[in-house]
């Protein structure tokens, strides 16, 4: 629920008249999501897993209560569910088994798990005789660090039992194919943006105006903020009228602030921390260039599609990013963005300088970026595609 792109799928399905129930690991609707919650009453649609660890007697009591709610047919399925849980107990906790019983009681047409590990958590349900269709969406870390940690066969049973597997980019698709995901059940559904909520503005640089650079992303190694900070400090030697704002929170905050202090860059580079959605939209409106310097982390973690790149292009920003994961697919190099190799501070700095020196190109780059998003990342079109996938899964299950 903390991922905006998941929320946009949920609200899009509700807008189309479908009933959606949400099963979440823990409470925590972030503040910037409450505006959606007011309209859609999402909290009343959300079921949270019981707190962990529960005493054994509480688990038995809750299991008995959930089983009592089941219809006789579902009770029969629950026996198969228990057997499936036992087979998959290495990747499904007792709490998640209780959630599976709750899902079983709901008699849902479709069970859609976002991120591969969540697909594994409902795997016991897939291995019963329930008629629900099972869809799993892969995003990024689930085909990189998760696989590195648990092995290349971690999704073997999921690939056997699932009905459809969606992915956000060709880069993610290639990783899934290497893991032996059945190609005939793979479908691309990119993560989009609501264009009516992402206001567009052509970017222009007036004489003497400060160049506003913006980064949006968690303060973790994978986001590569260190390299952008070093690059901007180099650019400052050439252009004095520059400011760089970094949105996000994370465990690298202290190290990044120490780097800013070391470079004596505090007057023009600022860590803003986490911001609300309305504050983020305001930052998009006033920025000229989005800097997104992601890298492959030391543990192998990589981004997937790069949703921030989509948001920025929709707003008309010029983009500077790295050749990381699916980024060359999400932007159009040379037309909507400039790309640099990962961890290459000099290349990042050169690209910032190039963009500033070619500021007359910004309006055309912004218009092309908006059109690119309208054609490929309009969440309304993507949600229509998602409904088609659901319908195809159900048609196949019924045949």
What are these language model-derived features?
Residues 166, 197, 202-223, 229-232, ...:
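Conserved donor-binding/catalytic core segment of Leloir-type glycosyltransferases
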Residues 274-275, 282-287:
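Short alpha-helical donor nucleotide-sugar binding micro-motif in glycosyltransferases
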Residues 333-334, 338-345, 354-359:
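Conserved acidic donor-binding segment of nucleotide-sugar-dependent glycosyltransferases
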Residues 257-278:
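Nucleotide-activated donor-binding/catalytic signature segment of Leloir-type glycosyltransferases, i.e.
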Residues 285-300, 317:
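Acidic donor-binding loop of glycosyltransferase active sites
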Residues 1-51, 106-108, 160, 398:
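N-terminal subdomain of nucleotide-sugar transferases
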Residues 309, 314, 318-321, 331:
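Short hydrophobic beta-strand element within catalytic cores of glycosyltransferases
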Residues 24, 133-139, 151-200, 208:
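Donor nucleotide-sugar binding/catalytic pocket of nucleotide-sugar-dependent glycosyltransferases
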């Amino acid at each position: 629920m903390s991922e905006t792109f998941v929320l946009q799928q949920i609200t899009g399905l509700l807008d189309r008249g479908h009933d959606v129930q949400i099963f979440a690991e823990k409470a925590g609707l972030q503040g910037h999501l409450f505006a959606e919650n007011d309209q859609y009453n999402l909290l009343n649609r959300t079921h949270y897993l019981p707190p962990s660890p529960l005493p054994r007697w509480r688990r038995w009591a809750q299991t008995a209560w959930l089983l009592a709610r089941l219809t006789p047919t579902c009770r029969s399925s629950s026996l198969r569910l228990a057997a499936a849980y036992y087979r998959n107990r290495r990747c499904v906790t007792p709490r998640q088994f209780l959630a599976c019983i709750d899902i079983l009681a709901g008699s849902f047409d479709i069970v859609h798990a976002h991120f591969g590990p969540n697909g594994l958590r409902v795997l016991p349900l897939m291995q019963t005789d329930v008629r629900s269709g099972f869809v799993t969406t892969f995003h990024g870390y689930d085909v990189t660090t998760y696989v590195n940690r648990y092995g290349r066969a971690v999704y073997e049973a999921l690939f056997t039992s699932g009905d459809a597997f969606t992915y956000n980019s060709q880069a993610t698709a290639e990783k899934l194919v290497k893991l032996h995901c059945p190609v005939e059940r793979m479908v691309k559904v990119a993560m989009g943006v609501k264009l009516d909520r992402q206001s567009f503005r052509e970017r222009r640089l007036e004489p003497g105006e400060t160049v506003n650079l913006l980064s949006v992303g968690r303060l973790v190694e994978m986001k590569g903020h260190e390299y952008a900070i070093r690059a901007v400090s180099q650019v400052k030697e050439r252009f004095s009228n520059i400011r760089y704002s970094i949105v996000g929170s994370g465990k690298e905050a202290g190290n990044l602030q120490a780097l800013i202090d070391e470079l004596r860059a505090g007057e023009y580079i600022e860590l803003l921390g986490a911001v609300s959605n309305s504050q983020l939209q305001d930052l998009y409106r006033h920025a000229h260039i989005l800097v997104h310097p992601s890298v492959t982390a030391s543990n192998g973690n990589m981004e997937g599609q790069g949703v921030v790149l989509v948001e920025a292009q929709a707003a008309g920003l010029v983009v500077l990013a790295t050749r990381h994961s699916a980024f060359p697919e999400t932007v159009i190099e040379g037309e909507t963005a400039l790309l640099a190799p990962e961890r290459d501070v000099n290349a990042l700095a050169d690209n910032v300088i190039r963009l500033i020196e070619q500021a007359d190109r910004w309006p055309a780059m912004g218009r092309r970026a908006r059109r690119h998003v309208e054609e490929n990342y309009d969440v309304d079109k993507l949600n229509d595609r998602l409904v088609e996938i659901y319908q195809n899964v159900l048609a196949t299950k019924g045949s």
